[in-house]
Regions:
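Canonical Rossmann dinucleotide-binding motif of NAD(H)/NADP(H)-dependent dehydrogenases/reductases
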Residues: 1-13
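Conserved mid-core segment of classical short-chain dehydrogenase/reductases
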Residues: 50, 73-88, 107, 111, ...
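Active-site helix of classical SDR
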Residues: 102, 138, 146
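Short, flexible catalytic-loop segment of classical short-chain dehydrogenase/reductase
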Residues: 160, 164-175
């Protein structure tokens, strides 16, 4: 996703706590002439979040697009087997951090009279999934805050939408080929297309929701899953 926005000439700011990966990616793209900055931001720390957006405003004066893509999951299990620590971490990263970032993003966008926010939810934000009560709660929450906030700021030239990815060929998912080949095969076969999605599929959807062509699209959740949720 960072690459795709950078390829289109955007000044991209990465917020994360994985410093090695973030700094390596930023350097790689900067060496190619792209404009990318990595900034360490702990999304559990509201002061760090606020300070990060103050820094954006001071450095760049505006914020045109925001992609809230933070996520965290736990092994599937019944709700009563989840610990309070697990609940707090999943809800904290997947919903509370996203909401807190949106608040700061909207403040800057309102001042400039323009903004595009894209949140990442999941099929778990549209359906109930056995063994995933906490994750479903968080991702359903992202859907709710996306839709409600979209109505709040529609007259401010700010659109707020969400993407619901299916199973995507990330490093984690690809690792299943070796450690759990049956699970990987099941993931492939569960897609109507018969194969997994690629990171570029998600990035393309995010870019589209930030383009002028989508300026009248607001408050929607776009499944990017080859039709998985269509049949459920």
């Amino acid at each position: 996703m960072v690459r795709m926005f950078a390829d289109r000439g955007c000044q991209v700011i990465i917020f994360d706590v994985q410093d090695d990966k973030g700094e390596t990616l930023a350097k790689e793209l900067c060496d190619q002439g792209k404009k990318v900055v990595y900034k360490h931001v702990n999304l559990f720390d509201i002061d760090e979040i606020k300070n990060a957006y103050v820094w954006i405003k001071e450095q760049f004066g505006k914020l045109d697009y925001a992609m809230n893509n933070a996520g965290f999951g736990i092994p599937a299990k019944p709700l009563d087997e989840c610990t309070s620590e697990e609940v707090n971490k999943v809800i904290g990263i997947c919903l509370i951090a996203v909401t807190n970032c949106m608040i700061e993003e909207i403040k800057i966008m309102k001042e400039n009279g323009f903004g595009r926010i894209v949140n990442t939810t999941s099929g778990a934000g549209l359906l109930g999934i056995k063994g995933n009560s906490v994750y479903c709660a968080a991702k359903h929450g992202v859907v709710g805050v996306t839709k409600a906030a979209a109505l709040d700021y529609a007259t401010s030239n700010i659109t707020i939408n969400a993407i619901a990815p299916g199973t995507i060929e990330t490093e984690l998912v690809n690792s299943l080929k070796e450690i759990a080949p049956d699970a990987y095969k099941q993931a492939e076969e569960s897609n109507p297309s018969g194969h997994l999605g690629k990171p570029e599929d998600i990035a393309n959807a995010a870019v589209f929701l930030c383009e002028d062509a989508s300026s009248f699209i607001n408050g929607v959740v776009l499944p990017v899953d080859s039709g998985c949720v269509a049949g459920k």
